[in-house]
């Protein structure tokens, strides 16, 4: 079941406002409708809110490559069969292939993002003997148990309502001795951008809406992995700040990499209003730094 309250960093006033809205969302059922939540995230990454998502790699490639390299430093994928849950444009999957994995299955909820991954793989000359593509839901993965040597996932878990059961599902697919490696959203990820966005959106539009986002502390992810039956569990936190020339550049990074999925809850006219208010707020403040806060987590399925 999704968490009711906001789990990331916000200023005290903004967090109070967010949690008041979340409580209403729980009572009305919005915060318990996992299927609708996942559908909104999917629509966001298919461009329902902003065309900026089409510039995902333009603004986010360096950022997500840094995260992906940090994640894969902790495991050996040489000759392994790998599943990438929530592959996006394929940054993590293609890096795994570059580092010697035998075969990668790239899975994502968004048809658009999966298509981008396929195009990049084809351009690099990877055929079906090395890579495959599947539309999938991370909470119900369409594979037999014990199918993969490694399951990897980059910056996806924070968008999933039922995180504990998702980790259990990933572990189910591992062969004995297989490795799960995940990067996910820490409490301060994009803090400055989220704070400005929350404050700039008209409150009557978002009241009673629980945004589909659940960042976690390092100890929470460690516990999830251990409770899912993994051994040799280890985690580490990775943080830095990205700097931008001006507020508009910061907004373009945030809009393209987040796809502003939460706005899919709104009608088209309100989407335009909210998007413009957020952009204007970024420019006026101006937002010139955005925090990256990542949890890297690893665990092994007992042999």
Report the location of each language-model feature.
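Conserved class I S-adenosyl-L-methionine
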Residues: 4-77, 91-95, 113-116, 125, 181-203
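Conserved Class I S-adenosyl-L-methionine
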Residues: 5-8, 14-31, 60-62, 89, ...
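Class I SAM-dependent methyltransferase SAM/SAH-binding core
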Residues: 83-85, 89-140
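Residues lining the SAM
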Residues: 107, 154-157, 183
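A short acidic, Gly/Pro-enriched loop at the edge of an enzyme's catalytic core
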Residues: 139-150
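A short SAM/SAH-binding and catalytic strip from SAM-dependent methyltransferases
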Residues: 150-162
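A short glycine-rich, Lys/Arg-flanked "PGG" loop and its adjoining helix->strand segment in the class I
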Residues: 164-179
